[in-house]
Amino acid sequence: MVASSPETLISAAQKCLCSRKKRLSPSSCLEVTIHIIAVDLGVKPALLYDSNGASPDQLQLYLHSLQESSVVSNSLRIMSINDNTFIINPDIMKSHLGELLKSKSLPLIDVCSSRKRPVLCAFERSAEEMVRSFLEVFMNGLDLVVLEEELYKDWNLCTFFGILLGYPASYWFEQTQGFENCLSMTPLVVCTVWVRWQIHEIKQRCCLYSFSVPEELWSDVQSHIQRWTDHLRERFSKQTVLTDICFSRDTVTLPSVTL
């Protein structure tokens, strides 16, 4: 990995990722770069880009600039689904999804609005079908993949995005009942994972993962999340670019939760 200057990376991000909605701040530019580096290093399978509404083509342009500067490898891909754009490490993603299909061990949390409280449910067949359908498209090897609505119109994208991002648990709800959920005023355990990246004199801190689990279900999923944490530590130890990994946990209660 070539150590480009912070100014060069910030300038490239602001140039490539310009948007009518929002100009990226220098700090945001470096955070985006850290996320992409983490994907490239296999610390996380994918990044959902939601910083300022930049298009998939703009993201591809920025990714190419990072690749040309040898900041990241040439193996990353971009996928767009329902106006959401992901940057994906194909090898890590295939391994991640293959293991998921084999074990079917991902805890799904049913938060249908018709329920009084969230409950754990088995790995739904619909979730398995989403993963298999995605892999069939993803295996075509294109650098930029745009999923057609016909493919994902019946998918629960909340569940699917949680799977793609490598979360140790994902929310699920019956879409035919609407998109509301039963998490209002429900205590949630919010887990975050932080890292640092030193580039010249700057030590940039970044939140790599943030996910939640209803507090009343924590004891049921704690062992699974601990295994996920141990596996993440193992992957993190195989690289030296990112440092100071830190895990934190807080409990919050909100009047409404958007998934």
Swiss-Prot record:
Protein name: UPF0739 protein C1orf74 homolog
Family: Belongs to the UPF0739 family.
InterPro entries named among the record's database cross-references: DUF4504
